[in-house]
Regions:
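A short glycine-enriched loop-to-beta-strand structural element that forms part of the catalytic core
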Residues: 36, 67-88, 110-140
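Short coupling/linker segments associated with nucleotidyl cyclase/phosphodiesterase signaling modules
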Residues: 3-25
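PLD/PLD-like phosphodiesterase catalytic module centered on the HKD motif
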Residues: 150-322
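Flexible, glycine/charge-rich interdomain/linker segments that couple
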Residues: 2-8, 115-130, 143-168
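Short helix/loop segment flanking the catalytic signature motif in cyclic-nucleotide metabolism enzymes
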Residues: 45-52, 80-100
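Catalytic-core segments of nucleotide cyclases and related cyclic-nucleotide turnover enzymes
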Residues: 14-21, 91-106, 122-149
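Active-site-proximal alpha-helical element of nucleotidyl cyclase-like catalytic domains
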Residues: 17-20, 43-68, 104
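Active-site-proximal structural segments of metal-dependent nucleotidyl cyclase/transferase enzymes
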Residues: 17-47
Length: 322
């Protein structure tokens, strides 16, 4: 097996990556641990040109010394792809790695007409061997390119720009749709509260599964319905954050983390962002008039993760996930 460039680059060819991936699968199965892969898809296929080596070097520099990086030739005429193998890394650890990689590769996107998609898969939840993980990650590339996050170019917009666009644009479909809620409508003005309770109830059915939930309303209070649901759920691995204007009883909230924000836009918007290993869900409701709300909801995991990333970044909340 050969390296395509200087030995100290730690950037390997496809043959080496495939062999190492098979070995990592055997090791993880033997020791009952996990590992993940990140597949980096660069479009258009010839767009990287002479900066491909620079992109590869940036990826190697961004990941850990124990991670293995190399070129992954497409089997069906895909463009140039880079693959990173992340030993002992779970789903949420992989998302944090992708955030770091995205920041490292941003300069290449601004200087050239490139589109870079980060896909991923984790052993054993997404496959029992390296080949299955790679197939899963390759399918996810196509799904991510079809996501609203990519189609509307939301990565380059501010958080509240995105919120305004999603809540004011009509969407219809299985993954993304718009609806109205409020007084006199089939869905009540308490729809967001009800959605939050349903998510907590779902999390309680698999309490060991990690997740992250942001729920934003005008004011944080110990009387919020979701807190009662959390109390009944017991210990769950989903981390719950309540966002809004801080009230006098914040110290009474024991089973969620208050995030006090004195932002007037939270008087107009309420939202839920929920991301777990298995699914993602977001609902955004914007107050209109007469106790009615214009709402948008989605099960697009890439869009949900993007919204969480934007929200955490613009309010300096750190890069915590589940």
């Amino acid at each position: 097996m050969r390296r395509p460039a200087a030995a100290d680059r730690r950037f390997y060819d496809t043959e080496f990556i495939r062999s190492y991936g098979r070995i990592e699968s055997l090791r993880a199965a033997r020791y009952n641990t996990c590992y993940s892969i990140v597949l980096i898809d660069i479009a258009p296929p010839d767009g990287a040109g002479d900066v491909y080596d620079d992109i590869a070097d940036a990826v190697v520099s961004a990941v850990r010394s124990c991670d293995v990086t190399g070129e992954m030739d497409g089997e069906h005429g895909e463009g140039r792809r880079i693959l990173v193998i992340l030993p002992e890394t779970d789903f949420f650890g992989t998302l944090l790695t992708i955030r770091k990689l995205s920041k490292s590769l941003d300069p290449f996107l601004s200087s050239r007409a490139l589109s870079i998609i980060f896909s991923h898969a984790t052993f054993p939840r997404d496959g029992k061997g390296f080949g299955e993980l790679l197939s899963r990650a390759a399918r996810l590339v196509a799904q991510k390119r079809a996501s609203l996050w990519e189609r509307l170019n939301l990565k380059d917009k501010l958080f509240w720009e995105i919120m305004g666009e999603l809540s004011s644009t009509p969407f219809s479909g299985f993954a993304n749709s718009s609806f109205d809620a409020g007084s006199g409508l089939p869905l009540s003005e308490f729809f967001v509260d009800q959605a939050g309770e349903l998510i907590v109830n779902e999390a309680s059915r698999s309490p060991q599964k990690r997740g992250i939930l942001y729920m934003a309303s005008r004011k944080i209070s110990s009387s919020l319905p979701i807190l009662k649901s959390l109390g009944l759920a017991g210990n769950v691995a989903t981390r719950v954050f309540l966002v809004g204007e801080g009230g006098p009883d914040l110290q009474e909230i024991k089973n969620a983390t208050p995030v006090p924000l004195a932002d007037p836009r939270l008087k107009e918007f309420s939202f839920i962002f929920f991301l777990s290993e298995d699914s993602g869900y977001a609902v955004i409701c914007r107050e209109c008039w007469g106790d009615t709300f214009s709402c948008f909801h989605t099960s697009d995991q890439m869009l949900v993760e993007g919204l969480i990333t934007k929200f955490q970044g613009e309010y300096a909340l750190g890069e915590q996930l589940g």
